[in-house]
Regions:
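Conserved acidic donor-binding segment of nucleotide-sugar-dependent glycosyltransferases
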Residues: 314-315, 319-326, 334-340, 354
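Aromatic "clamp/platform" in nucleotide-sugar-dependent glycosyltransferases that forms part
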Residues: 282
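Donor nucleotide-sugar binding/catalytic pocket of nucleotide-sugar-dependent glycosyltransferases
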Residues: 16, 117-182, 193
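Conserved donor-binding/catalytic core segment of Leloir-type glycosyltransferases
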Residues: 192-218
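Short hydrophobic beta-strand element within catalytic cores of glycosyltransferases
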Residues: 299-302
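Short alpha-helical donor nucleotide-sugar binding micro-motif in glycosyltransferases
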Residues: 261-262, 269-274, 365
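Nucleotide-activated donor-binding/catalytic signature segment of Leloir-type glycosyltransferases, i.e.
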Residues: 242-262
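N-terminal subdomain of nucleotide-sugar transferases
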Residues: 1-33, 366, 370, 381, ...
């Protein structure tokens, strides 16, 4: 988004965590310090950064702040916005209640709940439904506009009953997603291994991504179709060893390749090497990885869920299934037995992805920015005018 807005003639400054690793930053990037330790899942925690960000902002002529996380850096953004009279936009990227288990006490409660502990389950449910939602309500009210990446997330936010306007602004796809990659042929040859089909998925290897379901699903398919496919899992995370062990238990370890982290510019080559993109997560707000796959003419086979259903049209650019292993396996087998339908889906997938190219999305977001800035300035002028205007006081007659 920053690159496309710059292409349109705007100055965009990025404030991002310092990962303590070599990066080639430009003059528009500011790195704020983070704690040395990371919570589970390799998520960096911003340190006390208000003073650092405030000092940097004070030297820049900023018209608008767009923040992407509601905690810590989000509070810094709204505080600075209020102090400098700058409107603040927030994009609701994540179903935060589904990521509580990365914090140690809630991870402990999650384990207890999984073991059938009713007290742990009750406390966790209270935290998800009350603590998280109340915090988000408070934060969203401090913002001047909220972007939801999909219509389903916009609807999800309606029960929050906030006065802040909510607009739909999906994440755009960079040009590299639509390019042809010569490496795709070599990747397919390496991993297909004389099988008939090659599937892939791109995901953090974490519990909320539901990859254990995916492995059980492909195991069920193998039992019915035989050894006719391989699966590439791109990504890394805390569940990797557990997933490898599960693939061995299910006797599909020779069909599943854990590729690990792949750089963004190479992911499209893996997409182009495959026949179908498998997706099992039920915690997405948009599912940008689905659109990236579609850009490479790759149909998506996914569980019907928030975010996913906004981009996957069942039977057109992919297939949506329930989270029943039996139904999931049956639906996948049905696709594979209808190659003409699969070919048609490839074209529709590409057409869908083209609607999300970065340039189009940047123009859409720019319109929202302009509208917000104009309305914010009008409201600020009115408040300043009211505060500075003195009104005659009429003496009360007795």
């Amino acid at each position: 988004l920053a690159d496309r807005l710059r292409d349109l003639g705007h100055s965009v400054y990025v404030f991002a965590p310092d990962y303590k690793s070599p990066v080639d930053d430009d003059e528009y990037t500011f790195r704020f310090p983070t704690m040395k330790h990371k919570i589970a899942g390799a998520i960096p925690i911003p340190n006390l950064i208000y003073g650092y960000v405030k000092n940097a902002i004070s030297t820049l002529d900023i018209d608008l702040i767009h923040v992407h996380h509601p905690v810590m850096i989000g509070n810094v953004a709204t505080r600075i916005g209020k102090e400098f009279h700058i409107p603040v936009v927030f994009t609701y990227h994540t179903r935060y209640e589904q990521y509580l288990h990365y914090l140690t006490p809630f991870g402990y409660l999650q384990n207890k709940a999984n073991q059938g502990n009713l007290l742990g389950e009750s406390i966790l449910d209270f935290a998800q439904r009350q603590v998280i939602q109340r915090y988000l309500n408070h934060f969203l009210e401090k913002c001047d506009m909220v972007f939801a990446p999909t219509e389903s997330i916009q609807n999800y936010l309606k029960p929050f009953h906030i006065d802040t306007p909510i607009s739909i602004a999906p994440t755009g796809l960079p040009p590299a997603c639509f390019e042809n990659h010569i490496e795709a042929t070599a990747i397919r040859k390496k991993y297909l291994q004389k099988k008939q089909y090659l599937f892939c998925t791109v995901s953090r290897l974490a519990k909320e991504k539901n990859l254990s379901f995916l492995l059980r699903g492909v195991s069920a398919v193998k039992k019915q179709l035989g050894d006719v496919f391989n699966v590439l899992i791109l990504g890394d995370g805390p569940e990797k060893e557990n997933l490898i062990a599960l693939s061995q238990t299910l006797k599909i370890e020779e069909n599943v390749f854990f590729i690990g982290e792949v750089s963004n510019h190479k992911i499209s080559a893996y997409h182009q090497a495959c026949d179908l993109f498998l997706f099992s997560s039920k915690s997405e707000t948009q599912g940008i990885v689905l659109l990236e796959a579609m850009a490479a003419y790759l149909p998506v086979f996914a569980i019907r869920a928030t975010g996913v259903s906004d981009v996957v049209v069942n039977g057109e650019n992919g297939v949506l299934s329930s989270d029943s292993i039996t139904e999931w396996a049956d639906n996948l087998i049905s696709i594979l037995k209808n190659p003409a339908v699969l070919i048609k889906m490839k074209s529709s997938a590409r057409t869908t992805a083209l609607l999300y190219d970065e340039k189009s999305i940047a123009n859409q977001i720019l319109e929202s920015y302009a509208y917000l800035k104009k309305s914010y300035e009008a409201e600020h002028w009115l408040m300043m005018h009211l505060n500075r205007t003195s009104y005659p006081v009429l003496a009360k007659e007795y």
